C-alpha cells in the first residue's frame, strides 16, 4: 500500500501469488493451478482479470484473460467475474515465456501522473524522469538545474523526491487495495505518510 502511494519508479505493484514458464497457450490452465487464488477469493468474491504481455506470442492478452476467468469460475463456484463491479484484480504479467500472476494493489498505471494534463510531443515518462534524476546523483539538499527541461518532468519528479511528497497524493481514492480486506486503517496510513512531507525543502530545483 505504501509503495503504491509513494513509489516513483514503478508501473504496477503486484502481490505475487504464482509464476511459471510456458511453451504455448495450452500450458496456462494447468499452470494456473499453482497460483493461490483461493486464499484471496475467500474474502473477495467479485473479481476482475487483466493481462499485459511483453514479447512475441501466438495469442493475445484477451485470450489469457478469458482462460483465467474460466479457470476461476470452474474451480471457485462462489466467485463472480465483473468488468466494472469487482473487489479484487488478478493481474497476469507475461514476459516472453515467463508468466507472473498477482493481485494488483493499485488498479491503475502508476507511471501516469496527475500533474501531466497537456503533454509535450517529446515528453518523457515520469518513471524514466525520476530514474534520470536519481542517476544524476541528485540528493535532497542539493541544487538541480535542467537547462533542457521542456515540460519540466525531470525537475518535477526531483521536487517530489526532495520533499518526500507522495506521487499519488491526489489519487488516494482510486487505489484497488482500498477494496481489499487487509485489516489496514487506510486513512491513518495516508495521514502518517503525509505528515512526513517536507514543507520547505533545502534543495534548489530550476
Q: What are the language-model segments listed below?
A:
Residues 101-135:
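SAM-dependent Rossmann-like transferase core, predominantly class I methyltransferases
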Amino acid at each position: 500500500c505504501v509503495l503504491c502511494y509513494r513509489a516513483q519508479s514503478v508501473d504496477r505493484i503486484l502481490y505475487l501469488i504464482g509464476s511459471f514458464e510456458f511453451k504455448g497457450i495450452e500450458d496456462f490452465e494447468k499452470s494456473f493451478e499453482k497460483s493461490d487464488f483461493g486464499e484471496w477469493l475467500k474474502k473477495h468474491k467479485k473479481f476482475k482479470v487483466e493481462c499485459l504481455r511483453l514479447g512475441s506470442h501466438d495469442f493475445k492478452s484477451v485470450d489469457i484473460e478469458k482462460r483465467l476467468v474460466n479457470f476461476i469460475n470452474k474451480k471457485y463456484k462462489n466467485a463472480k467475474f465483473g468488468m466494472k463491479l469487482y473487489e479484487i484484480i488478478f493481474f497476469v504479467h507475461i514476459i516472453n515465456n515467463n508468466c507472473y500472476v498477482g493481485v494488483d494493489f493499485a488498479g491503475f498505471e502508476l507511471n501516469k501522473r496527475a500533474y501531466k494534463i497537456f503533454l509535450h510531443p517529446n515528453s518523457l515518462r515520469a518513471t524514466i524522469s525520476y530514474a534520470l534524476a536519481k542517476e544524476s546523483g541528485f540528493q535532497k539538499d542539493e541544487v538541480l538545474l535542467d537547462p533542457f527541461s521542456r515540460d519540466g518532468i525531470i525537475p518535477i519528479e526531483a521536487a517530489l523526491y526532495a520533499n518526500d511528497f507522495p506521487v499519488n497524493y491526489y489519487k488516494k481514492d482510486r487505489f484497488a487495495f482500498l477494496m481489499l480486506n487487509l485489516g489496514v486503517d487506510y486513512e491513518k496510513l495516508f495521514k502518517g505518510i503525509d505528515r512526513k512531507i517536507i514543507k520547505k525543502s533545502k534543495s534548489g530545483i530550476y
